[in-house]
């Protein structure tokens, strides 16, 4: 069983842009953002809004939910990295997510 290669949101959008031979300035213009902001997204310095991720997905004709998931998992991973969290903390967070799901479903 092979594992899927992990990538960041920024790496993914950079790859998609290069596969379509699009310069950053054209992608940025299409998304109505500054080129420097797109570069920050590609370098994982900043995270775009959900609305912008949907626009990016439409531009590159990819599944928006997959891109949103990738951006969200990046955000979680960076937060855990910053907090120097261990696996015990991750298990507690998983349990809390399950608890919150049950609370929200009544």
Regions found by a protein language model. Give the residues of each.
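Alpha-helical residues within the helix-turn-helix
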Residues: 18, 29, 58
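DNA major-groove recognition helix of helix-turn-helix/homeodomain DNA-binding modules
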Residues: 32, 49-66
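Short alpha-helical DNA-recognition segment
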Residues: 21-40
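Helix-turn-helix DNA-binding elements, focusing on the entry/boundary residues of the two helices
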Residues: 13, 24, 35, 50-53
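A short, Lys/Arg-rich alpha-helix, primarily the initiator
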Residues: 1-19
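Short, charged recognition helix plus adjacent turn
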Residues: 66-106
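Residue-level detection of the helix-turn-helix DNA-binding "recognition helix"
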Residues: 18, 32, 43-45, 72
